[in-house]
Amino acid sequence: MSLRFVIGRAGSGKSTLCLHEVQEELKQRPRGETILYLVPEQMTFQTQQALIGSEDVRGSIRAQVFSFSRLAWKVLQEVGGASRLHIDEAGVHMLLRKIVESRKDGLSVFQKAAEQNGFFEHLGSMIAEFKRYNVTPSNVYEMWQQLDAHSSSAEQKLLANKVYDLQLLYDDFERALIGKYLDSEDYLQLLVEKLPQSEYVKGAEIYIDGFHSFSPQELEIVRQLMICGARVTITLTIDEKTLAQPVNELDLFYETTLTYEKIKQVAREEKIEIEKTIPLMEQPRFHSPALAHLEAHYEARPNEKFNGEASVTIHTAANLRAEVEGVAREIRRLVAEENYRYRDVAVLLRNGESYYDVMRTLFTDYNIPHFIDEKRPMSHHPLVECIRSALEIISGNWRYDAVFRCVKTELLYPLDVRKETMREEMDEFENYCLAYGVQGKRWTSEDPWMYRRYRSLDDTNGMITDSEREMEEKINRLRDVVRTPVIRMQKRLKRAGTVMQMCEAVYLFLEELDVPKKLEALRIRAEESGDFLFATDHEQVWEEVMNLLDTFVEMLGEEKMSLSMFTDVMSTGLEALQFANIPPSLDQVLIANIDRSRLSNVKATFVIGVNEGVIPAAPMDEGMLSDEERDVLSAAGIELAPTTRQTLLEEQFVMYQMVTRATEKLYISCPLADEEGKTLLASSFIKKIKRMFPDVKDTFITNDVNDLSRSEQISFVATPEVTLSYVMQQLQTWKRYGFEGNLDFWWDVYNFYVTSDEWKQKSSRVLSSLFYRNRAQKLSTAVSRDLYGDKIKGSVSRMELFNRCAYAHFAQHGLSLRERDIFKLDAPDIGELFHAALKRIADRLLRENRTWADLSIKECEHLSTVVIEEIAPLLQRQILLSSNRHFYLKQKLQQIIFRTSIILREHAKSSGFVPVDLEVPFGMGGTGSLPPMEFSLPNGVKMEVVGRIDRVDKAEDENGTFLRIIDYKSSSKALDLTEVYYGLALQMLTYLDVVTSNAHTWMKKGHAASPAGVLYFHIHNPIVEVKGDASEAEIEKEILKKFKMKGLVLGDADVVRLMDNKLSTGSSDIISAGLKKDGSFSARSSIASEQEFNVLQKYVHHTFENIGKDITEGVIDIAPYKKGNKAACTFCNFKSVCQFDESLEDNQFRTLKDMKDSEAMEKIREEVGGE
């Protein structure tokens, strides 16, 4: 029994020496004593290849490469102890979830924390750490007793409570495993116990290579290996000079030196012979003087400079994508020009979550075979999502999001249906569920679902149309597709008495859905498209889910469990599932994490993402215990994993390992922005490399080829898939700025695409975008007639929409596009309710021959309650009755109508104007409807402007009859004459024109009427600020001011006083007008003369005629207006249709100039030739 160390700096040949010794031994004695070669898990594959990679050694039974866990399997198979079932990470998380749920009421700290994402991953890691560091539940309990006895501060009490929770959960976990199961850490403890019984290990020659440190548990394994084996050889990355000095935590080799001392101490304790250490002083790895210099002087202070041409390259990239593309181009160049194999190249990085998806996509585009040494979670696979969402449907009372997450896995679809058709039908079905707010018992009820198009509150027609009947049948058919398998599982789960029966319900759910056949179809499709990685995913996921169910049954099969706990435990297990890495092929680029990789002897290494806070890593407190808490435990004798501070000290060694992997070339790069455009800073580590290699230039990587030289641009000619976008970029530049003669090779590339049989069709579609203009072609007369007919009937809102954006009008009224209806209360619904409520109150007053002024406060409250109760069942499929939240909202809306009724009562008391009618239709046909506003357009098309007027008021005096329009709004609004001029605010003036033009036939007395004005009434329940001692009357007066109506009124003092009979001088509290002492109007009054009202009405007619002419002539320009901070696109539903983009030459806003009312009025006069 002896111990031998082989030490040396990185690249000194430690592993090579050991491998050569093993190979020589195998050549000389192929059947001798066992040779064990122990390496970290991630090194096993490459070490196995290296061991049998020589011509003399093509295979071996005598020598085997193991990791600690694989050696445990081997030994336990030999001597026994492996009869207990293995529990993987998913099983551990499930068991912990069950333990936490059962212990929840007794936990001090983790009761709420258990609901946070990642909690069980952290808890599992903490327990694994306890085991690796030989900390038992009793050790943790003793620690809690010490802490609890001496806790005085809040921090100390928190730690004591945390340790208490940990010991409870750890103890329960260990008790659950005893005699039944083994987790990954248990295998190592069993290995320690069983090694003395192993004949396989006894007398073996043992090599331990690639480790820098050992946990206490691993150190015990090393102890037993030294006792059982003939000789143990351990390699450590240490400079021999370090061993001659006192150990300093700032030393580059501090961690490995500590490991060296710990192992020697174990050898002394076991009286193991310690052979003379073999120090390796040369640098055989490095074929590059620059890389040899980097390794030899890495830790030197100040930095030793290397002058001359270096094989070290530094890149700064515009963004993360440009960085990865730069790496891909250089890898292809190395393979094409320097005879590299892909296996000669490695990419090292730390923040893989930011890079892996981009690298998979781009390396595939560049045809670079690659292997990412990182396990991927299964959580996004359709099968895992189907199980998780189906269980959430049942436990969460059929919520919309869970139902349609399950639907979109497409595993609920019948096996024999055409997926494309089913997807379209399910999209329609989802729209129905959103529009009708379907959830809860409606899914499980046997009552058929009804389908009716929601039209308005006034639509009381109960007849169902044929199209509605067809849609109803389709919806009920699709409902059964979705609910039948889930309800079947729901019933089985409710009947289940044990966990085994619950797992059986899940299994039957999957079998009845024909999931194995569906996954097989997905696998075949992936293989046919050449995506072999995803093909194997579909195989793996079924196997892993079945293993998970088996583990669940094995662990908890006979226990009883609530449905909610079962769902939580199952979801926890599903979250932990991971795809196994397929071993890399013989010729692939290896992409690996800096912290976990154990590469050796690759020719070129690319270290990417070298940004501040990433390399070196910023300190982060993660897991169950903070650094301070770990220090407290350490001081009390419980050794755990290194703290953040210790990890940061080790960062220098990690970075040293990172830059000493390559034999010929080292590339270091960082992006200046991430995928979202957020700024990133270069790491200080790059500055260090620049100081060591002052002649190395930091080159900038960009994907804009126009900024690069000819030779640099040529490197962008890679695969046809990738190069096509750069050809487009060049052609776009030449089109805009002209051709540069020295870049003619791009024409050769272009000619390849247009002449290649394979690429001609694909490239033509892309290249055609070069001449793309986002313009909507004018419709032909025939198409326009087909869309709009020979007679156009439209509302004022439709005409205003055309002036806001002609294309939006075309999308809504030509193509009849609509946003999907969602079961929610929007502003239009609230506005409709307000209108209907006030009309019902007004109609009741008219029937009773009363006015608003006759109402008492109590009657206002009563009537507002009555009408809201009448309307609520009719609004938006009874949305106000659908939930407690909406019921509360109904009460708030009733309060607003109550407040509005009070204000209308006050207005009526102060006004000579009385309502003539509400919701007055024009051009709608039927009794009581006024005629439409009619136009005969130059092209022969007839156009009618129709609508419904909120309220018409009338007043009479010796000068005649006056009419005014009141429009109810749920938000504050005023009449802007600039918007009238641009055709954006035509509604009120149109209404006024309709009622005054038809007064002689409409009014009962049959005589003409003059315009008195147009006013907006803001329906709301305002909050006012008053002094603390303000009386109720003062408060009511302030509230009344908040309801001042804005608009435009006739500039006649008598008419204004009819609107507010309390007004003598000053500003009115009711309308936006005021009088001076001399009887003239104040400057802030919104007034117009009768002649100006006539001009405005003429202008409205003129504008409508122009709009009608443009509509019928096929104008659909993508030309939205912009006026100040208002723009047509702000609330437009059709932005995704028109693709308006200001960066395109053709897409610019129609900027409308803001004007004073007087200036706008003058322009309006000019347009119609008014005086």
From Swiss-Prot:
Keywords tagged on the record: 4Fe-4S, ATP-binding, DNA damage, DNA repair, DNA-binding, Exonuclease, Helicase, Hydrolase, Iron, Iron-sulfur, Metal-binding, Nuclease, Nucleotide-binding
CC cofactor: Mg(2+); [4Fe-4S] cluster
Domain UvrD-like helicase ATP-binding: 1-343
GO terms of molecular function: 4 iron, 4 sulfur cluster binding; 5'-3' exonuclease activity; ATP binding; double-stranded DNA binding; helicase activity; metal ion binding
Binding site for ATP: G8, R9, A10, G11, S12, G13, K14, S15
UniProt xrefs under InterPro entries: ADDB_N, DNA_helicase_suAddB, DNA_helicase_UvrD-like_C, P-loop_NTPase, PDDEXK-like_dom_sf, PDDEXK_AddAB-type
Annotated cofactor note: Binds 1 [4Fe-4S] cluster.
GO terms under biological process: double-strand break repair via homologous recombination
Similarity comment text for this entry: Belongs to the helicase family. AddB/RexB type 1 subfamily.
Subunit relationships: Heterodimer of AddA and AddB.
HAMAP family listed in its UniProt record: AddB_type1
Function in brief: The heterodimer acts as both an ATP-dependent DNA helicase and an ATP-dependent, dual-direction single-stranded exonuclease. Recognizes the chi site generating a DNA molecule suitable for the initiation of homologous recombination. The AddB subunit has 5' -> 3' nuclease activity but not helicase activity.
Protein name: ATP-dependent helicase/deoxyribonuclease subunit B
Organism name: Bacillus thuringiensis subsp. konkukian (strain 97-27)
Lineage: Bacteria, Bacillati, Bacillota, Bacilli, Bacillales
